[in-house]
Amino acid sequence: MARMNRPAPVEVSYKNMRFLITHNPTNATLSSFIEDLKKYGATTVVRVCEVTYDKAPLEKDGITVVDWPFDDGAPPPGKVVEDWLSLLKNKFCDDPGSCVAVHCVAGLGRAPVLVALALIESGMKYEDAIQFIRQKRRGAINSKQLTYLEKYRPKQRLRFKDPHAHKTKCCIM
């Protein structure tokens, strides 16, 4: 019942990257959250909001939970961006096509901004990244976050030489 007012999880796929954008579960809704993660094959969850559930049940199911909280409605701090991109580079080089779940409270601000950054770092224009995400997650990304993405200058940290690079584990840095 708690999920009725929340948007359903959405998958965003681009090149060899897959993301699951979702809202935060509670301990009461954790079992359905874990089912969603398994359905999409997500083995890593990035939590960018305050803790609302015990991560032990996820870890018991082999799902890694990473905590990088930052303020609601705000763009991510530089350290979160660096850690996020580093995690993705390792994850998608080692296991192309795998899925990384990311959530904030409603799945409309902080989580979509991180996914947009990944798309931009992989070569997509910021306008296209925002449109791509908003097609699947209506209402995502507020004006402050939009300005941040517009001014963001990618270093192409997620440009992959070859979508089949997993054979050589070779990524462009």
UniProtKB/Swiss-Prot annotation:
InterPro entries, alphabetized: Prot-tyrosine_phosphatase-like, PTP, Tyr_Pase_cat, Tyr_Pase_dom, TYR_PHOSPHATASE_DUAL_dom
Domain of life the protein comes from: Eukaryota
Prodomain residues: 171-173
Record: residues binding substrate: 110
Main location: membrane
UniProt keyword Disulfide bond present: yes
Maturation and modification: Farnesylated. Farnesylation is required for membrane targeting. Unfarnesylated forms are shifted into the nucleus.
GO biological process: cellular response to leukemia inhibitory factor; endothelial cell migration; Notch signaling pathway; positive regulation of establishment of protein localization; positive regulation of non-canonical NF-kappaB signal transduction; positive regulation of vascular permeability; regulation of DNA-templated transcription; regulation of vascular endothelial growth factor signaling pathway
Role description: Protein tyrosine phosphatase which stimulates progression from G1 into S phase during mitosis. Enhances cell proliferation, cell motility and invasive activity, and promotes cancer metastasis. May be involved in the progression of cardiac hypertrophy by inhibiting intracellular calcium mobilization in response to angiotensin II.
Protein name: Protein tyrosine phosphatase type IVA 3
Organism encoding this protein: Bos taurus (Bovine)
